[in-house]
């Protein structure tokens, strides 16, 4: 009887609170979210660097309340995933995070960054993958200090999600830029992918050694379909550049194999592959299904396909931004980012992820 009355009282209080307009705050699905990557997910880390690769000016952020350093008109994929995971706030950039903010996670991504150290050097300063991992190690030391000891910190960090999206610049701003880099003369596409994956694995093992256990590894998108690639290498301005996409697929296949190997090697961790390439190809092949009318031109850019010069300060963008797959010469629009993020979180097809999607990763 006493138990029944206690339950009845709890239900009554709950109904009363709802009736008075109080909202019960739900906890996020994971305690924290750590992000490693390049301009696709950079949210301001390059703002303070001496770099051409910056997006801290209008019209970037036109649908986000103003420029923040995000290379989009609005949200990036990780912004959407942050919402889907139940966080109240977007994950802060490493360059601005302070105090206990780090407990919800940190975004270390840096525009022009690559797996190889020299990648993107022609654009100026950037935080390479290894540099981002070093910054994470500094964060771990702060987490230990806040939580009191290494055991508590380790238990906390193992429940967080670690999103890694690296490799695009190793092609865009390295391998396919022979005027600045010699890698295309040193390596075949297969050899180059092997080199990248070897370096990638080393950094993932470093993250593992510092507490990371839930990894979402995002494959390279179809770079050969970007307005910049179309402007330079597509005769009709519509057909994707196969030599670039072919190299990207080789890398992605190696990445899938690495996921299998790492899952076999670390029974206490989970690694999953996010097929951004496949999702992107599906959007381009079936644009109307996602509400798009333009798949090959930048909403903000200059020249052929809007891809010869990327979005410049003060340049007026297109008005129907939600109908464009690409925001600028290289980066997806907020609408495309949303579509890709949703498929990463809750896979529509078995080919979207391997072996599990991010919603399942969060539940582990």
Swiss-Prot record:
Tissue expression notes: Found in phloem exudates.
Annotated S-S bridges: none
Record bears the keyword NADP: no
BP GO annotations: lipid catabolic process; systemic acquired resistance
GO function terms (MF aspect): hydrolase activity, acting on ester bonds
Enzyme class: hydrolase
Active-site residues from the entry: 39, 328, 331
Entry-linked InterPro entries: GDSL, GDSL_esterase/lipase, SGNH_hydro_sf, SGNH_plant_lipase-like
Inducers of expression: Down-regulated by drought. Down-regulated by virulent or avirulent pathogen infection.
EC number in record: 3.1.1.-
Keyword terms: Apoplast, Hydrolase, Lipid degradation, Lipid metabolism, Secreted, Signal
Any GO CC annotation of this UniProt entry: endoplasmic reticulum
Annotated compartments: Secreted, Extracellular space, Apoplast
Protein's UniProt keywords contain Signal: yes
Signal peptide: 1-26
Stored SUPFAM superfamilies: SGNH hydrolase (SSF52266)
Matching PANTHER family: GDSL-LIKE LIPASE/ACYLHYDROLASE-RELATED (PTHR45650), OS01G0748500 PROTEIN (PTHR45650:SF3)
Function: Involved in EDS1-dependent systemic acquired resistance, maybe in phloem-mediated long-distance signaling.
Family the UniProt entry places it in: Belongs to the 'GDSL' lipolytic enzyme family.
Protein name listed in UniProt: GDSL esterase/lipase At1g29660
